Curated annotation (Swiss-Prot):
PTM entry text: Phosphorylated by MEC1 in a cell cycle dependent manner and in response to DNA damage.
Effect of K177A: Impairs dsDNA and ssDNA binding of the MEC1-LCD1 complex
Name of the protein described by the UniProt record: DNA damage checkpoint protein LCD1
Keywords recorded for this protein, A-Z: Chromatin regulator, Coiled coil, Cytoplasm, DNA damage, DNA repair, Nucleus, Phosphoprotein
GO molecular function, one term: damaged DNA binding
Other facts noted in the record for this chain: Present with 606 molecules/cell in log phase SD medium.
One Pfam family this sequence matches: LCD1
Gene Ontology annotations of biological process type: chromatin organization; DNA damage checkpoint signaling; DNA repair; establishment of protein localization; nucleobase-containing compound metabolic process; regulation of double-strand break repair; telomere maintenance via telomerase
Ranges of Low complexity composition bias in the record: 146-160
Amino acid sequence: MRRETVGEFSSDDDDDILLELGTRPPRFTQIPPSSAALQTQIPTTLEVTTTTLNNKQSKNDNQLVNQLNKAQGEASMLRDKINFLNIEREKEKNIQAVKVNELQVKHLQELAKLKQELQKLEDEKKFLQMEARGKSKREVITNVKPPSTTLSTNTNTITPDSSSVAIEAKPQSPQSKKRKISDNLLKKNMVPLNPNRIIPDETSLFLESILLHQIIGADLSTIEILNRLKLDYITEFKFKNFVIAKGAPIGKSIVSLLLRCKKTLTLDRFIDTLLEDIAVLIKEISVHPNESKLAVPFLVALMYQIVQFRPSATHNLALKDCFLFICDLIRIYHHVLKVPIHESNMNLHVEPQIFQYELIDYLIISYSFDLLEGILRVLQSHPKQTYMEFFDENILKSFEFVYKLALTISYKPMVNVIFSAVEVVNIITSIILNMDNSSDLKSLISGSWWRDCITRLYALLEKEIKSGDVYNENVDTTTLHMSKYHDFFGLIRNIGDNELGGLISKLIYTDRLQSVPRVISKEDIGMDSDKFTAPIIGYKMEKWLLKLKDEVLNIFENLLMIYGDDATIVNGEMLIHSSKFLSREQALMIERYVGQDSPNLDLRCHLIEHTLTIIYRLWKDHFKQLREEQIKQVESQLIMSLWRFLVCQTETVTANEREMRDHRHLVDSLHDLTIKDQASYYEDAFEDLPEYIEEELKMQLNKRTGRIMQVKYDEKFQEMARTILESKSFDLTTLEEADSLYISMGL
């Protein structure tokens, strides 16, 4: 039984095993657990290694990127540093080049100074040699007597004890005596320096110049005149440290201000303070309706003396403020320059014939314009880099109003003021021309600003100048003349005969303080009216007016160089007015002035040549800006004027010296006498006139005589005229035009 039961259990187990084996998959598809574990472990390890590799690679990439960025930053820094070093090197090169140029200029200046000193020493040596030769001829050489025989016999018989004394008392030679005598004479002729001498400083010299300033024609100095003036309606004037008490003399207060400033201020601060204080005082007097204006012209004269004393000590800002103030002052007294040309029929002349108030107004206006000119002259002496600190729109607007008053067309002109206004314009053009970089100033002073100014200069150029009518007030407005009521010297120029200069002192009482001027009658001026008709006075005034026109031509020439491309300035109008002026002056020389014994004929010839130079530059460099109708307008006059330069017999004009001497005696005798005086100076210096100097003087005389006679001009001007005539713009090909031209010229 037990075996049966065991057999049954064994058969059941086998069945179970078989069933289990039947349900299992094939053997080759089964993976042992170890391999399965390996398969599960391999991807995980691969993932770990790949992530670690990726992390390492990303770290390496980040490091490389950081290194690249760092290298790029360092490269850019090095590049910037190289650029900076290159810029510094260029700056150093430029600085070194400037220094080299400055050293070269300085070296050349030193060489020039040494050459001058050497030449001076050589001249002194020659003069000393000549003086020594002259003395040697006059002096007689004195022979020294030989020692006497008695002395020689005594010296032979002297005792040994006295021999030493005899040896010490040797006779001296004549040369040593002569040398000692000359040394003594030199010592006696030497002037010893005073060790206690005190050299005045700049402020002391400045104070002295103000205290000694005197207007030409006045009997008293300016400070002495102000010492006799007081403020009547202004109770007390006070500005900072400048105080004028009621009834106190103006000059005394100014002197006390000068003494206080001298102790504490340097020269530049001294000048700034004085200009400001005096300007405020002038303003208070001018704007007060009841206060007398008697002190104003003398205060303006003091301001001019302050400005021009030391140009380097007057700052640009002080000059600018002073310029604006004077323009405002002229605006206050503008009624002086707005006198109608023709008197009204309603004027019955019943007012009192007094002149003192008119004289004060004329002095204020004239001195103010002189101060404007003086300010710009001081500015011109300053460094070129500082010019732009002065000019701005306010300066230009103020001066535009001022020059329109001076260069008037609708009112009676005042010649003293015209000179200053024209010179201010000339200085402005010279400043622009001489600047290293003038583009900023050219853009500030544009062509539109110049348009009206040039028109007024054209009108001034058209006015005629006659020596007999320079003081004639009955002539028309086409002739330049000076009124006898304006005949006083200015602060810069001595124009006229200063007939009214003596009346300045008559305004002032010498024995009391005053605020109102003394009475001056117009009849006092008419007493010496015959003096104005003297020829020499007329010639002097004519010379001044001719120089005025030369200044106008200088302005045109400067504008050609500055605004050559600006058609609003350089255009056919300039050609028209220049051609008319050239033709008119040549006709006057031929018809009226040849044969007159006038010292101004050569100056008129210079104006003709100067005008031709302007026309030549217009024609040569700016022809595109000239319109054809403008050229046709003056074509006949211009052709005639140019032919007058060419039609002369060059070979025979100066051939006969005797004939030229006769011509000089007829047309230029005064200048001939002047040259003879110069020749006498040479004869006094050299004991005889050197041949080369004589030839040079003769050549100058002959050229001058030929120009005055209008028969010979210099070759360069003839070449200018020939160049214009031979240009394609003139068509002189027809026989009728050529015949009419030659007939009109008398050929």
